[in-house]
Regions:
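C-terminal output helix
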Residues: 124-134
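Two-component/phosphorelay signaling modules centered on CheY-like receiver
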Residues: 28-47
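CheY-like receiver
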Residues: 13, 138-159
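Acidic, metal-coordinating helix/loop segments flanking the phosphotransfer/catalytic sites
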Residues: 48-66
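Receiver (REC) domain active-site loop signature in two-component systems and cognate sites
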Residues: 73
Length: 159
């Protein structure tokens, strides 16, 4: 018997037909651009939060298959949010992508060391964002832990 993953479909965490992506960004214009880009694939239900605290609340309610996070937001920044999610066993393995205008290598390292799976910069290409979503949804917990350890070792070696 064939299963959906043989045809490139990735099962979601809840068993629904559509995978759910939570976008957390305080800029409504950017949120609309991200929603448009993600909806180009037609495979995702997109839900939104406009700051880190609201985003944290929505994660527990919505149980998304992937979370896209901005860094600079009111009430809780993206790095704090990522650390909070990685510190909670209920959200430890939720795929996280930072999408930020902060482009320095140090910003990216802070993101990865906070536990995000992918760090993309604005402006972004819809194809790159969609590829990142597909990639992080496929990561296993062991893949995620191995990547964080490698990044931490590489970062420590440069200090």
């Amino acid at each position: 018997m064939l299963n959906n993953t043989q045809f490139g479909e990735i099962p979601n965490r809840r068993g629904d037909a559509m995978k759910k992506v939570l976008v957390i960004d305080d800029n409504p214009t950017i949120v609309e651009l991200i929603k448009y880009a993600v909806n180009l694939q037609g495979r995702y239900d997109v839900v939104v939060a406009y700051d880190g605290v609201e985003g944290l609340e929505r994660i527990y309610v919505e149980q998304p298959d992937c979370v896209i996070i901005d860094v600079k937001m009111p009430r809780m920044d993206g790095y704090q949010l990522a650390r909070c999610l990685r510190g909670d066993p209920r959200t430890l393995n939720v795929p996280l992508i930072i999408l930020s205008a902060m482009t320095r290598e140090q910003d990216q390292m802070t993101g990865y060391l906070s536990g995000v799976d992918e760090y993309l910069t604005k402006p972004f290409k819809p194809s790159a964002l969609n590829a990142a979503i597909e990639r992080v949804i496929l990561l296993t917990p062991a893949d995620r832990q191995r990547r964080i350890e490698q990044l931490a070792q590489g970062h420590a070696g440069r200090e």
